[in-house]
Amino acid sequence: MKLFVPALLSLGALGLCLAAPRKNVRWCTISQPEWFKCRRWQWRMKKLGAPSITCVRRAFALECIRAIAEKKADAVTLDGGMVFEAGRDPYKLRPVAAEIYGTKESPQTHYYAVAVVKKGSNFQLDQLQGRKSCHTGLGRSAGWIIPMGILRPYLSWTESLEPLQGAVAKFFSASCVPCIDRQAYPNLCQLCKGEGENQCACSSREPYFGYSGAFKCLQDGAGDVAFVKETTVFENLPEKADRDQYELLCLNNSRAPVDAFKECHLAQVPSHAVVARSVDGKEDLIWKLLSKAQEKFGKNKSRSFQLFGSPPGQRDLLFKDSALGFLRIPSKVDSALYLGSRYLTTLKNLRETAEEVKARYTRVVWCAVGPEEQKKCQQWSQQSGQNVTCATASTTDDCIVLVLKGEADALNLDGGYIYTAGKCGLVPVLAENRKSSKHSSLDCVLRPTEGYLAVAVVKKANEGLTWNSLKDKKSCHTAVDRTAGWNIPMGLIVNQTGSCAFDEFFSQSCAPGADPKSRLCALCAGDDQGLDKCVPNSKEKYYGYTGAFRCLAEDVGDVAFVKNDTVWENTNGESTADWAKNLNREDFRLLCLDGTRKPVTEAQSCHLAVAPNHAVVSRSDRAAHVKQVLLHQQALFGKNGKNCPDKFCLFKSETKNLLFNDNTECLAKLGGRPTYEEYLGTEYVTAIANLKKCSTSPLLEACAFLTR
């Protein structure tokens, strides 16, 4: 980070010694009024002795994005559409702070995109063709991306023949779309009011630019409809009698009063956000600056300078006037995760051909964790005729993120990860079902899931080892945050010891996903070359059920936390792997919570807990389609599928338990549409919630922000 010597405040200060260097944030502005406000902010912050700010001037938002990427500026506030652009190559900026709207009692990090019309104008949303339109600016959320995404079916747009702007120019009789190329699309600048070169400008030099500008375009009678945000009418017309002259167009082709925006809007849009570089981005310094600024100059804090206010005749300089403050965005959240899958889908719909959009909706993108799962997924994709395609990530958390972004649709998860995915807004779709002795006559797909037994396994020869003497022993875990391998045993241990120091109970462990430098990774081996040690995927030799049991079988650890089936699947000749083919079931014992030990045949009376079955999760808007496709896929490639084993088997792996557990008989339907809490059960959810009090994860922190 660069240090600088602040300029002396006045000539009278020349006799003073130079001040100590202070860290500086270079704020990017896109107009003369913004630059003047920034300079006033700069002066106020100097008086506080807080983080210093200097003001950088550029012509429009994209130039600010470039300046930040090139380290010629550090921060700027952007609308969601520009947050998306900023996050793309080559800029790779990320949002670091979100504006907060609403009220102090009910703060929100989103706003509503609305279509405003004058009362008495006789048309609905599906009758906009041939009308005159007012937009905040090209590429902006409420003014362009959302309405064009909704109007796309009416645009007669042939993607291969012309850009979207050309279709919009033909759809409306005239428009004002600031930031557009007025030479290429004169019709989209026809209503704009700027003079000369300023007509259609991407700043307040165009009077109809931005939210208030687009509404003024409607007020002045230039346009028939203004695409703005829900607060625009209230900010420009404080009197109810004046507001009553306007209405909102609703998606169901009705109209509503302007104060009914929660029921009548085009979309819910993420807040404007401050963006910075994702590497060397001065995030902490920017947040320190914003925190101090909102503390001193936020709503109703100061008469001399208002951070969320603009001079008469101006609106939304630097920040939206309607903002109440800022909320820091967790480091795990990039631009795509911040905007969310629905917003990103709208963007994709405007960038892809109709055929591409249809193909994206038809297929299911499965997320594979690690290279071995990716290999199996690609085989599945090929055999499915591309009805299933593959995305891949190195960790389960990263796969969950891909589903949240809409870059993948589904994956199969252990109960611990179902908890995380549920906290992030994903829903269970289908559950793994094993053979049942209780309901053997029922169709597997319709049979209730019974859960599985989480157990602690030790060598029979290690005679003195019981549940009560595990302290300072060596442990083998499937992975951090997984049910049988982590959540259940560590939850029990935390309850017994009252300590959250996970890495102090056992002398050494292999818990893939833990800090590689900690004791919890000391026993992990990585791949055949010793690389990727302790990663939570199949590159780590001791990852997963089979890996944790192997860690015990090879005398690396004293105890393995797995499921009951794991012992049976890897002993008495059930596995052909070199390390397992000579293992005898009788050589292992289960640890019971009462301090006794029992043979592995007695798991029903000697286990740590009954765990919920693994289940497929997806976004709620894709759940029904994912379910339909998977049921068809298992009819082809399931245990009794017509193409298994000849072509491909979903529930069979070259190693163990790739994509699905190998002992899965079928993917079963769930009764109704259960939430993740209903699927996991209150007892299990409570246990994990208590465990998470010890240590949360970056993904859970991110999702707590995204779902607030």
Swiss-Prot record:
SS bonds (residue pairs): C28-C64, C38-C55, C134-C217, C176-C192, C189-C200, C250-C264, C367-C399, C377-C390, C424-C703, C444-C666, C476-C551, C500-C694, C510-C524, C521-C534, C592-C606, C644-C649
Amino acids binding hydrogencarbonate 1: T136, R140, A142, G143
An annotated Gene Ontology molecular function: iron ion binding
Glycosylation site list: N252, N300, N387, N495, N564
Keywords carried by this UniProt record: Antibiotic, Antimicrobial, Disulfide bond, Glycoprotein, Hydrolase, Immunity, Ion transport, Iron, Iron transport, Metal-binding, Osteogenesis, Protease, Repeat, Secreted, Serine protease, Signal, Transport
Positions that bind hydrogencarbonate 2: T478, R482, A484, G485
Source organism (scientific name): Bos taurus
Activity-regulation annotation: Inhibited by PMSF and Pefabloc.
Coiled coil segments of this chain: none
pH-activity note: Optimum pH is 7.5.
Family membership noted in the UniProt record: Belongs to the transferrin family.
Alphabetized PANTHER family for the sequence: LACTOTRANSFERRIN, TRANSFERRIN
GO cellular component, one term: early endosome
Post-translational modification, as annotated: Poly-N-acetyllactosaminic carbohydrate moiety seems to be needed for TLR4 activation.
Residues that bind Fe(3+) 2: D414, Y452, Y545, H614
Short name of one Pfam family: Transferrin
Domain of life: Eukaryota
Temperature dependence: Optimum temperature is 25 degrees Celsius.
Protein's name according to its UniProt entry: Lactotransferrin
